[in-house]
Every structure is written in C-alpha cells, then in structure tokens.
Amino acid sequence: MEVQSLLNFDLDPGPVDQSILVWQHEHRSAAIWEDEVPPRELTCRHKLLGMRDWPLDPLVCQKLIEFGLYGVYKVAFIQLDYALITALVERWRPETHTFHLPAGEITVTLQDVNILLGLRVDGPAVTGSTKYNWADLCEDLLGHRPGPKDLHGSHVSLAWLRENFRNLPADPDEVTLKCHTRAFVLALMSGFLYGDKSKHDVALTFLPLLRDFDEVAKLSWGSATLALLYRELCRASKRTVSTICGPLVLLQLWAWERLHVGRPGRLKDVGASYMDGIDGPLPDPLGCRWRASLSHKENPRGGLDFYRDQFDQQKDEQVIWQPYTPDLLAKIPLICVSGENIWRTVAPLICFDVVEWHRPDRVLRQFGLHQTIPAPCDNEKALHAIDKRGKSEYDWSARHSRHIGLWEARVSSVVSGEPECSPMDYNDPYMEWYRRITRRIISPMNERRPGQFLPTGFAFQVLVQRVAAIHARSRASLEEELTVGSARQTLQDIVDMCAGALQLNAPLGSLSNGSVAQAPTPEPFLMLPQPTPTIIPQKPMGGEMVCLPLNDMEIDDGLAAEPLELMPPVQDIGCEQSLSSVSQKPLFWPSGGKLTFSWVCEVMLVFDWSSKNLPPCEFSSVLPFNVLDELVLFASKILKKEPNCVRIDSEKAEVVVVGDLHGQLHDLLYLMQDAGFPDGDRFYVFNGNYVDIGAWGLETFLLLLSWKVLLPARVYLLRGSHESESCTSMYGFKNEVLTKYGDKGAAVYKKCLECFQLLPLASVIAGKVYTAHGGLFRDVSSFLSDKQERNRKRKRTQKKQTDNTVLDTEDRSESLPLGSLKDLSKVKRRVIDPPTEGSNLIPGDILWSDPSKDTGLFLNKERGIGLLWGPDCTAKFLQDNNLKWIIRGKGAPDERAKRDDLAPMNGGYAEDHEGLITLFSAPDHPQFQDTEERHNNKAAYIILQIPECEELKFQPLEAVSPRPKAEAYYDFRRLIHPPSNLVHNITNSVDSPSSVPDDKDNLISSENVEYKSMDLSEQMEVDEKDDVDSKYSESITDEVAAFGTPASGDRDMVDFSDKTENGSKEADHSETAEISKDLSDTVGKPESCSRTRGTYEAIGTDAKLKSNTPEAINLEPQPGCDLYVPDSGNSTESRTEKAAEEACVGRISIDDCSTTGDAAVELEITYDEKLDRVVTEITGNDAAECMTDGNRDIATDGAENLEPSTSKLNYSEPSEDIDDSTMKFRHNTSCVADSDLETVNGGVNADCSSSSKCLTSKPVVAHDKFTNLTKPSHDKGYGESADKPERVIKLVTYSKRKSSDKKHMIESNEDPQQKVNDSVDSKNKGSLDKSQSVPGDMDS
C-alpha cells in the first residue's frame, strides 16, 4: 500500500456497529456528512408571543399553582438559542431517545421536567377523546360560543380568546373565574406544548380535561410535555426536516444545566418572587434561575458550526451528569420533587396521539448510578406515523389503551443500578461498546473557503492520516531487507510526516515536557491494515492457482470500518476442504455511505467465504438486510442520474468490457483480478445478464453494485434481458433471493427489480465502440403509425372472417427503419419488463435483438420481442454513428449451437458481422447441466485502449474449478429436456411474465417465445398485441371467428384500436409509487422444494387454444394434439390424440349477466370420453381449481377499463342436462375471495392434498396449483359402451362493466344464447359488440 494514499483518507464518523442506530441513513447527521443539508439552523416555532401582554391575575395565578402549571408560565418566555437547539437535534437518536455525545448517551428525563418546570410527573396520562362539538364545548366550559370565523375544526382563534378572556372582571364569581382560568391555561399549554403551523390558533384538545379542576391537578402534565419533546426531536432529526416546535424551552434549560456548549453564565442569582394577593413566595421551579442576566464570557455563544464542532470534541469532564445537588433540591418547591419515585421508570409517555418511550436505563449516570451496556430497546417507530391528522374525532384513550396500561404500572418498571463511585474509565466495557455503536462526528470534513470556520476535526484527521502513514511506512521497511540507506530514508520520511502533523496541531499540547494524554478524544474509527495481506485466490489460464495480495494491485486502498477475521488463504477457490472454523463476521455499512476499496474487498471475501461455508438460507447472517438496503439505495441514486446511453471518454485509459455472467460469482472474482480492479485508468463496462441460472446471482449483482457505488465514474452496469421480472421468476433469481433472505426475501427481490429498471441500456466508448446487451434497434419515428397499422390489420381480419373467399395468406414483412444513437435519449427505460407494443419499444429491441445472416431489420416473430438484423444494418449503424465496433452479449453457447447461421461461442466470443462482436463471460455455462451435455465453453472479456480503440484484445477465461457445491434455483432438467410433444401456451400480454423463459442463451430455446411485459414505472395500460406472430387454430369454426378470433392464417392478434398505448398521458403521473405498488403484488414466498412449474394445457388437434404471454415452445413442429399437465410435481404425462378421431367442435354461448352488469362469453369445446381419462390419470382427481390474480386493466373499444381480474379454472362432472362431465375455465373480473385457500407462489407443490391459491401479478396459463375436490362418482350405466356422451369444455369469460354503461348489458328479458346463435347464423358482424367479446387476456 502506498504511503501517500493513506494521507487522503477521511475519518469514519461511525457507527462501526450499526446494530443500534439502524436508521442512520434517514438521520440528519448522514445528510450533513454527505453535504446534502444546507448549513443553516432549524426554524423554531412557538405560539407564546400572544401571551406576553396577557396579564396574569392573582386569582388565576393561584389556580395555576394548584394545577402545578405555574412553572411553565414562569419559564415560557426565555429566549431560545436556535443554533444550540439545532446542534442538539443533530445528536438526538430516535432509536434510543437519547443524545449521543462523545462521552456517552444523555437525555431529558422525567427528573428534568419535574425539577426545571415544576410539572407533576406522577399521575394519570394526559389523554382522552376528541369526539366533541367544539362550539358547544366552548360555550359550556368557557361561557362564550366562538363564531364560524373563530372556530377552525378543533382549534380556536387566539385573538378570540384574548378578546373575551384577557381581562378578568373585578370580583368575578366562581363560574367566571373558572372560565377565565380555563382560557388562560388553554392558551398557555397549547402555545407551550404545541408549535404547529397554525400560528394564530389554539388547540382545544386540552379543554375537556379542564372541566374538573380537582382532576386537572392530578394529571401527569410533565410526562405529556416530555412525550411531545421526544416526538419533535425525532421528527426534526430526519434529514429532510427544516423546522422544529414543541416545548423547546425545556430542552434549552436542560442543556444549560448539563452541558458546557452554549451555556451562559448567570451574573446573579434570582431570588424568590412574590405577587400581590398571594401569601408567601411563589413556587418558582429551578428553571427560573435562568431568567437572570446572562453572560457568555466563559462559554462563548457561537453559530451552528461552532456548536457542532464543540460537541464533536466534548470530553467527559465537560458534562455535568448530576446538576441537581442535594442542596438545590432542598431549596426548590416540593412539587419539583413530587415524582422522585418514578424518575427512573421505563414506560411510555403519553399525550393524546403521541406515545414515546422513556429510557432512563440508558443514562443511569444522570442518577448517580454506574452505566452498564443497556439492553436493546424498541421505541416502536410505527408510533411516529400516528398523529391527529384526519382524526378530528377520535378516542385516543382507546387507541393507546395498551400503552396507558404500561404507564399506570410505571412504579413497577423503575430501574436500579450500582452507585457510581468515580468518573467512568475510558476503557470501561460500556465506553468500548458505545464508541462502536455511536455517531461520533457530525461536522463534515469537506473543504472550507478561506476565512471560514475550520472544525477541530480536521486536525484530528491529519493526525490520524499521519499516524496511519507512519505505521504503513514502518511496516513496509520491516518487511524489506533493512540496510543503512533504507533505514535512514524511512526515518527521514517519518520525521517529515511528524513535522507536518505537529505544524498543523501545535495547540493540542506540548510534547517537550513528555506529557501524554490518557486517550484521544474523539477516538478515530480508522482501522489500520491487517498484518496479513488480503488474498483472493485465482486460477490462471495455465491451470495453476495463484494467490495475489489485494494490496499489490495498483489501487489506493481504503481502510475498512471493521476488519474481518480473514480465513487462511485457500489454494482453490472452489475447494471443499475445511476452511477457517471462525465464523465470518457480518458486513456493516460504512458511515455516510462512503465506500472504500477495502470494504469492497471484504464484500468479495465474504461472498466467497459464504458460498463455501454457509447454506443459502444463512446468507443474510453475513450480509444483513440493512446493509443490502443501503447498498441498493446508494446505487439506485447513482444509476437514476445516468442517461440511457452512457458515454465513456478519457485521454488515455483502459476499458474492460464484460459479457453475460449469469450468477457465476467465482468466475467474476477471477475475471476482475485477472483484468485488474477498476481505478483511475481502468474502466469497466458490464453488458448485462448478471443474474439467473447460476447459483450466486444475488452475490454477483450486489458485488457489482458495490463497485458502482465505490467508483461510479469507472464502473458502468448495463441492463440485460434477464434483469426483468419475467426472466428472474423463471430462471431462478427470484427463488434464490427468497431462499437467502427468508421473510425479507420479498422486500429484497422488490428492491432488486426496482434497481434493474434504473440500469442504462447502452454505452458508447470513446465515441467509437457501441455496447449493449442485445444490439440494434428501430427508428423511433416508426412507432408513430402503430395505431393506424393496427386498425388496418383489424379490418383485414374482420373481412377474412366474413368473406370465405379471402385467402389466408401471411403478411410479408417489410424491413424496419434502423434507429440511431440520438433515438436513445427518447427512451423510457424504467420498465420492469420491456413492452412489445406501443411507442416504447426500444428497450425491448436493445435487450432482445439478435444478429442474422439475412439482410434487413425485421421483427423477431418467433420470439415475439426484439429484432433480427443483418450485416447491412450493422454496416449502416457503424457508418451513421461514426463507430468502429459493436459489442453485444446474449451469446450462450448452448443456444448458439442451435443456430446454423451464427458462429459457435465456445471460445467466449464470435464475430457475427464485420465490426459486430458477441461476447460471453460465463465459462462452463450453464453450470447445472450434466457433464455429457455441457459445452465446456471458455469465456472471454475484451480490453480496449482508449481513445484509439484500434483493436480489441480478447482475453479468454476458463472456469474456476471446482465450483462450490450448490443446488439450482430453477428446474433446469425440465427446461433442458422438455417433453417432445409439449407445446407451451402463450398467454396475452397482460398475463404474468413471471412464468416466462426468455433469453435464447438460456437452457431451453427461446427462439419461438412470444414476449410481453408491463411498464411499471409509467403505469401504462397495455395495448393489444398485433405485430407479433402468433399461432392460432387451423380449424376454429366460423362461429368462433364471428366473435373476433382471427383466422388461422392471418397470424395477427385480436386488437382493440382504442386501447391506451404505452407512454400514454394517463400514465405519466405515476412512477416510483406505482412501481413499488405493482412490484409488491408480484413478490411472494419461495417456490416449493421441487422448483417446478405446473402447466395446464388443453390443446385440440385442429384447434389449439393459445393466449399471448411468452411461454417457451419447442422448435420442432408438434405431430399431434397434446394434453400436458404436471401431476403435483411428480412425473408428467401427455397424450397425443389422433386428429381424425378427436377433432374438437367449438361454439359460443353467452351467460345472462344483466342483473349484475357483467357481460360474459362462454366457449364450449366438445371432446370424447378420452379427455376425462387423461385428466384423471394426470391429476388423480376429477376436479381441480386454480386461481390467479390479474394486475392490469384492459381497455376495450368503448374506452371503459376492465377492473383487475381473477381467473378461475375448474373441471367437474356435469349436471343432468349436460351429457356427462363439464370442464369450465373461468376468467372472472370480479374479485374472488377464498379464505380457505393457502397462498402458494411458484411451482407445483409436491403435495396437492391441501387447497391452495397462487397469487401472481398477472393471470398465467401455467397454473401453479391444483385443488383437490371430492372425487365424484361416475354413472355406472355408461360402463364401456361406445355410446358414451361427449365431454364438454366450457371457457367462460366475464368482463366487469360499469354500472352506468347500460348499452353493453344484455336485456334480462332476452335469451342470451339466442342472441349468440342469431349473431353467428347471420354472419353480418365481424365480431360481437365489445361487451360480448373475449377479453384481451383470454383471446382464443
């Protein structure tokens, strides 16, 4: 490690151990350190100015004394020091309800409230109901009724109170005196305790409590005051808050009593006070002594920067832990010590809607007791979300009954401890623990302009840097061969470094007299490098394993906050030998989010260690959820600011381009060490596909995010086709995350999906090399006529349906216009799955397009998303954009081997066209195939020298071997060996992408996959698909065609022209909130252990029912009609029926739903008896049910939207009027509630004996769960007779209509079936009215 690099490190402000201050990322101190908070003070609001000239009549004063509220009046008008209040807020921690100072935790307790304000603390909680007619209540208790202009909800105008109650009449009667007293107390306590935005109004909340004066004197006004102070401190400590209110006078008095920072000196003591009409001295609380003349000679009064720096350097002797001496307590009024028995109670403090916990067990030194390491506390953060907004009439005593019960038991929860005999030692166990969990430094270490205040922390930073450099220099000398010359040079270097430090820090003390401080304050959390160099093992191409110290990489190392106990070097990264028996310590997030190189190295070591030593379910023990959350949050902030196409330019540097990784963590570790870690002269561009298939996709992605946060201008992560919900749900990443994080897996998966959407789509290196995962894209101007083109296709389809003379000829595709780099700026990339229709198609093009040997640019109709482009397009794109090379990914060798027109990928790269390189960086992929089926491919990465980019240097990689053992998170065997006669259904675009295998570099072929997605960031409504080729039945009858189903030869989708396009204005207002909402609906628990997906497909010989969402289909044509159903995770069976014998006949019927406003379409397909046997053999039952949730509205021609839908599939024996048995597929837009169903997400459960319900983001055809019903008995009369009745399959779809849309409903007095038959016979219509058409997600 270079000594010079150590001279540039900042102090770590803490906490090192984040187990206590878990909300640090939300705290104001984090924003200050990151320079996000303007250097100004908080605005302190209060409403007591209107009380200054409100005279206190002796009669009213006597009542205040009886209530125990007189002390508030006496201290309420002390001037506030805004800078001091702000500096204290920066030290307040909502997690503990204490201030974190360098000397330890300290806080305002019930003792302080009782003594300083004279408020009663031992009594019933201040709470109750607010269900009142406030005008009537004012008239009842105040004797006056406020007018409409004076009464604002539960607030009344302060001017109205002053006008009616400012002057008490002479010789008032008891009623008048009580009314005036109530008005004065109401204005005083409301102004003192509350400081909301209603500056000129007074809260009437306390008025009901003032009815009975005897009860007022018993209430615990002190605990209510402290609760409101805690709540305001917690709220103001958030990084985005700029104001504070509440009883801030109490906070300032407390600070003056206990802390030296900002504390003035009293020029003289204040004597007892008297008032005419009241015998004896008034009961002034201790806080009244600060109403004297003050001086700042001893402790200068400064601004916020000065106070902040003073707190950073505060020492233990500058804190007065026990300011209330016995002599003082003997002189103050008895009410000030009336609650001494509960000063140390651990209990909730209550004031109507506010509940905050009192934690004296964390500050026992304030009570003269020895402080030990306190037990973990839970201050119930959820309580902060409870307030009075929207609850003007609410019974708070009932809402907080549990906490009120705890307060009533306050005496039993008083803490105790051993007396503190002497000041706490610096090395006391509590202090050692505290220094690890606290935030020690608040002042940021950024550059200051000349003449600005320079915090003392800069001096300590210089000292730490010099000592660290001296340590490194000395250690390096000891490791070298020591000569006289080298020893002299080392000593000279140390002298120079010491001289520099002493020159800057002369005031810290004289070293000539030999005096040495007992311990530095504050202690810097800067850990020196470990004696043993950090090692990452690697396997070079020659086959021999070499271990290189990270410190030998030419990178300025950072110093980690908490060094790990490193395991011994391992000579084989995948070895199964026993590693260190010492458990790996969990990672902690560096304070302020400022990552260091050492921290990222620790991440690599931890991930490598856990992959060999821990089961996946224990991964969160080394990478806690809060660390992952911080990492993704910081990375997302960086990615969000990057353009769709990032540009990398440098005068002279090296760029490493990496292809698909697919969760192969250990190969990535070797790759980065082989190529050299990112630094000032080395860039990295990763071309996507970080997750899925491999067993360590999460670690791979998080490691790359760590590098991105560390070096955002040197590491660039582009998006791949597998960074989507559809792929990750199919190829294992979702299951991997849910397995590794258990109950929090759903939240982790959601965060990853949100981060995927922020990844850029492409990069341009030195203006000469274009990189993207898929490749080229079409011209954005071609999207403008999509709607007109769909209308044309729909009219042509209708003409074919009504005119049998029209030949069913396929459209001859025309070459699309090629896009340019300028078009990328118009792309909306924040989509969880790329759209396949509408005006935002470029993301799908970039992620899913493939090269072809044929010229031109065409839709990839076999896949349903992306393009195919020829060498002419490559040449044109390079020429138009002045580029030399195109580097893409998506080149899995097993899939490339299936394409005769493309070169194989076993070497890790291929030149598909002149200037077009396909790169693949996952060696020996996919890792879970059997040995005889493996391609044993090498991988590669590319090194570019910029700005020339004259040549590409291909660096081959072999797989690190052997890899640690791991199980697949997806059913790779089924995907590798699909049944030869299996044809996957293709559901509509609104169907769940979670069941979609997609990338052609995956284990099964995706060449014929039709792909559809949702744009979650824009909340766009999905158009019906028209340009994507779909395979329809060749023998659907004319009756079916009359209802809008396209003819078989057209190969176009049913389209509703008036549907909203992607990117519509209706979606523009929704982005982040809708993303989170939609994503939360798609995430669930892990799939069953079998990791298989159930697929139910009923396909006829001449009529195959298909929908439009991507499902993989075999490349080989299917010889016959299949029925394929997995039987609960066990072996599957399929039956091929002969076309001539089992042809199916379809007819349409309509259910009468006029009474409910639901239009319905029912399709009956008749089969013979064999179908029932197939279903029975496969499922073991004669009845099953599956439900799925749909999550996308469908817009029909009329413009109304369908409500979110649920699909219901069932089959059962028929009733008497139906021959034998009926299978019904139901898609009902009404919400289906079934409380008895157990939620299951993912594949078919191995045990189907219990009912279950599968919830997904969209309806899926690959149904995940069957529900056993009672097995019905067969009619024995049929026996084996050849005259068995036909089986009937009914497909019933419902579309929910608005109650006001009567024109779409079928009249109840009409025969709905007759309407259908008439419509079919007439053949005058191309399709039914939209109310009778099949919804888009159930097109047949």
UniProtKB/Swiss-Prot annotation:
Its cofactor is Mn(2+). Residues 788-814, 1012-1093, 1196-1218, 1266-1340 are annotated as: Disordered. The keyword Hydrolase applies. It comes from the Eukaryota. GO terms for cellular component: nucleus. Its EC number is 3.1.3.16. SUPFAM superfamilies: Metallo-dependent phosphatases. Residues 1203-1213 have a biased composition (Polar residues). Disruption phenotype: No visible phenotype under normal growth conditions. The keyword Metal-binding applies. Belongs to the PPP phosphatase family. PP-7 subfamily. This is Serine/threonine-protein phosphatase 7 long form homolog. The gene is MAIL3.
